[in-house]
């Protein structure tokens, strides 16, 4: 469980410049120093511990918690700690509809599985060099966008977000679907959009890493309480027709749906 010393050492108390703030965050601000808001770490500690227990209990109930953080400071930690606790993640770019249009996202993940099967069974070697190259490129693009959620069979039960301002589309989708949002809140954030806020710096690498590490720890603790193995992912057979469809799509050089802003 996080301590006051952890928060101080990781710079969790440093907010944004005073000209860049959301007035709704006033109750979480301790004061101002050299034009920078200082977050009240007593409140951070209280919210952190409360949220830790919420996340732990969700994991103990077998719920899926999606990690989201696509900015440079967050991408590495999001992937590392999501993998450490066996949860899905998005760290490249949030594609509109990842939750609200999940069926279409699952179809794209299926295409990734088809290409990988073609590589595995050798059928990709029967294609021309150009066809094989186009399929490989498509696979790389699909992996970049969807690799972290490929085993997520349904919408998540909760999302953990680093930087709710940058990830506003993900937060909006979660709010629309009534999926609880857990997130650190910097002084420029809107607390009304987050179900389980933790006031703190969401920009500094060490601070971001601490948040991710603690959430992963809470999840692993919850999983241990659950005392049962997760269900194995069933592999769905891939037909020749599916292989043909994915190849035709790759050869058409159409932009992957998610490329469009």
From Swiss-Prot:
GO terms for biological process: translation. One of its GO terms (molecular function) is structural constituent of ribosome. CDD domains: RPS2 (cd01425). Residues 230-239, 248-261 have a biased composition (Acidic residues). The keyword Ubl conjugation does not apply. GO terms for cellular component: cytosolic small ribosomal subunit. The keyword Ribonucleoprotein applies. Residues 222-261 are annotated as: Disordered. InterPro entries: Ribosomal_uS2, Ribosomal_uS2_bac/mit/plastid, Ribosomal_uS2_CS, Ribosomal_uS2_flav_dom_sf. It holds the Pfam family Ribosomal_S2. Keywords: Ribonucleoprotein, Ribosomal protein. NCBIfam families: rpsB_bact (TIGR01011). Belongs to the universal ribosomal protein uS2 family. This is Small ribosomal subunit protein uS2. It comes from Campylobacter lari (strain RM2100 / D67 / ATCC BAA-1060). The gene is rpsB.
């Amino acid at each position: 469980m996080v301590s006051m010393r952890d928060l101080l050492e990781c710079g969790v108390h440093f907010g944004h410049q005073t000209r860049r703030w959301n007035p709704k965050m006033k109750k979480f601000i301790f004061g101002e120093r050299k034009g920078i808001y200082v977050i009240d770490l007593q409140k951070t500690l209280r919210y952190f511990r409360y949220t830790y227990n919420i996340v732990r209990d969700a994991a103990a109930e077998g719920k899926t918690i999606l990690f989201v953080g696509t900015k440079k400071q967050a991408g590495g930690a999001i992937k590392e700690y999501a993998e450490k606790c066996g949860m899905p993640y998005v760290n490249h770019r949030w594609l509109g509809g990842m939750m609200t249009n999940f069926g279409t996202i699952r179809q794209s993940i299926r295409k990734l599985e088809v290409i990988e099967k073609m590589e595995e069974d050798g059928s990709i070697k029967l294609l021309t060099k150009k066809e094989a190259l186009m399929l490989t490129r498509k696979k790389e693009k699909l992996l970049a966008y969807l690799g972290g959620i490929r085993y997520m069979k349904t919408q998540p039960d909760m999302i953990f977000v680093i930087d709710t301002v940058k990830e506003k589309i993900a937060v909006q989708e979660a709010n629309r679907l009534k999926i609880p949002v857990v997130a650190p809140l910097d002084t420029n954030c809107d607390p009304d959009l987050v179900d389980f806020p933790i006031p703190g710096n969401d920009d500094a690498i060490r601070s971001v890493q601490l948040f991710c590490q603690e959430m992963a720890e809470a999840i692993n603790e919850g999983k241990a309480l659950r005392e049962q193995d997760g269900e194995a992912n069933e592999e769905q057979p891939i037909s020749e027709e599916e292989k043909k469809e994915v190849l035709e799509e790759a050869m058409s050089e159409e932009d992957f749906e998610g490329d469009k802003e």
